[in-house]
A protein has these predicted regions:
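Short helix-loop junctions at transmembrane helix boundaries
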Residues: 21-44, 381-422, 433, 437, ...
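Peri-transmembrane interface segments
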Residues: 15-30, 105, 278-334, 343-345, ...
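N-terminal Sec/SRP start-transfer signal
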Residues: 3-23, 50-91
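Short beta-strand boundary microenvironments
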Residues: 175-219
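Mechanotransmission and gating elements of multispan inner-membrane complexes involved in transport
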Residues: 168-176, 221, 225-237, 241-321
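Transmembrane alpha-helical interface segments in multi-pass membrane proteins
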Residues: 341, 349-395, 419-427, 435
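Hydrophobic, regular-secondary-structure patches
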Residues: 89-180, 199-201, 206, 287, ...
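Hydrophobic alpha-helical transmembrane segments of multi-pass inner-membrane transport and secretion
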Residues: 78-105, 314-350, 373-382, 430
């Protein structure tokens, strides 16, 4: 039964090939997880080890020889090589742009808070918009231990109210968007020393006057100094523009009592922001309010509060960015696989000849990977540079936790560019690995016959 033995041999070879492929995929998956977590220092160590291996070992020098031949022919395969470069550039560009949006939004809100100021909301409130603090509670909060006092001896505390109004956007005057109006007390300026009037003047208490943030001025129609606005059925005058370089740039500020009266909020407030004597005084302040039976409030530092406000949207943007990037990366991997399989097929005789004269499989595999990852590196650098050029500092707006527009800038940080490069190199590695392994495993006689 010779044929039965042949069939068993063929089946065994196929099974071994399947197991080898499965093992390769599993190793690849583990490698990608490790690669995603590697810090720049570890990547630098790996790169140094690769360079030393290429320069100081026999197989390394063989790898350089094979890689040099392949890289020298890239110009002859310009169209196919461009598919890899442009595909990976697209992946990196989309990924970095999406992550830059999330990082910019998060940075804007995190800059709003500090560790030496605290915000008090009604217990169980996630944001100012659904918080209410009665008038009797306001003085209790302001007089709590740990609250700093100003030169006049009064607590540095600002009871505030936050309401939402609709204004036409400059990008589309026919469409309205939400803008946050914040009613603040006299101490609001002391609490937030970064808020500076850059045009006009501050509002006067008791008058229907507003100062607007630079971000809101850029986004909405009719907020120039001297303009009249109709809000809550009343005429308001814009008397100044302020710069805060945080989320307050998206707001309109007015006198707390005047805003509360216009929107029929009575004598209540929605939040109280205080300056602490020191960041260490926060625990004392929080403990005093938590133990007071007259109060049922949530207390947090303003840094903690605004960081929490950014977490939800930042998480969504990150998930969407990684999902879209992954889908595009799969397409780029198939493009790289197709290109490199074609390149290997065209060079089958050359690779077979090298192996026949003593070149082992490892130099062939590494050489093909070096060629693919060089193209991937070019694509990653191109995608990162174009994204930085277009999106870094780009101004956008989105709905914040108070259902009002928050103006922020995209932030293409070095960390995001590094993430994009790691994605590019991972795509190049996957796209080159399987063609490289095939080239190394293909029997010399078969390669010579096929070519």
């Amino acid at each position: 039964m010779p044929w039965q033995g042949v069939e068993e041999t063929i089946a065994m070879r196929k099974f071994k090939s399947f197991l080898g492929g499965l093992g390769l995929v599993m190793l690849l998956a583990v490698g990608l997880v490790v690669w995603a977590r590697l810090p720049p220092v570890a990547v630098g160590v790996l790169l140094l080890a690769l360079v030393l291996w290429l320069l100081l070992t026999r197989r390394g020098r063989q790898t350089l020889s094979v890689a040099g031949v392949g890289i020298s022919t890239l110009g002859q395969r310009l169209g196919a090589s461009s598919v890899i470069v442009i595909g990976i550039a697209g992946v990196v560009g989309v990924l970095v742009a999406m992550l830059a949006m999330g990082e910019g939004f998060q940075a804007t809100l995190q800059q709003t808070g500090s560790d030496d100021t605290a915000i008090v909301l009604r217990g169980g409130s996630n944001a100012e918009l659904n918080s209410v603090l009665e008038r009797d509670n306001l003085s209790v909060i302001a007089q709590a231990p740990g609250v700093a006092r100003g030169a006049n001896g009064k607590p540095v505390a600002s009871a505030e109210i936050s309401v939402v109004a609709n204004l036409p956007k400059k990008s589309d005057p026919t469409a309205d968007a939400n803008v946050q109006i914040r009613g603040v007390g006299d101490e609001a300026w002391t609490l937030r020393p970064n808020v500076k009037i850059v045009q006009g003047r501050r509002f006067k208490p008791g008058l229907r006057e507003l100062v607007v943030g630079q971000g809101a001025l850029r986004q909405f129609v009719g907020l120039e100094v001297g303009q009249q606005l109709r809000l809550a059925g009343q005429q308001w005058t814009v008397v100044g523009v302020f710069a805060a370089n945080d989320s307050h740039d998206s707001e309109l500020w007015g006198d707390m009592q005047t805003v509360a009266s216009a929107y029929r909020r009575g004598s209540s407030a929605q939040s109280v922001t205080v300056r602490l004597t020191s960041p260490q005084a926060f625990d004392t302040f929080k403990a005093a309010l938590s133990s007071d039976p007259r109060l049922k409030v949530d207390v947090s530092t303003t840094r903690e509060y605004y960081t929490k406000q950014s977490e939800g949207l930042t998480r969504v943007i990150r998930v969407v960015g990684i999902t879209v990037g992954t889908i595009m990366a799969i397409g780029a991997i198939f493009g790289a696989l197709n290109t490199m399989f074609a390149a290997i097929a065209a060079r089958a005789r050359e690779i077979a000849t090298l192996r026949a004269i003593g070149f082992r499989g490892v130099p062939v595999v590494v050489a093909v990977l070096l060629e693919t990852m060089l193209l991937a590196l070019l694509g990653g650098v191109l995608g990162g540079f174009v994204t930085w050029l277009i999106f870094n500092g780009y101004t956008a707006s989105t709905l914040g936790s108070n259902f009002s527009q928050v103006v922020f800038q995209f932030r293409v940080s070095p960390q995001l560019l590094w993430t994009g490069l790691k994605w590019a190199m991972a795509i190049g590695f996957i796209g080159g690995l399987f063609p490289a392994v095939r080239a190394a495993r293909l029997p010399v006689t078969t390669a010579l016959r096929e070519s």
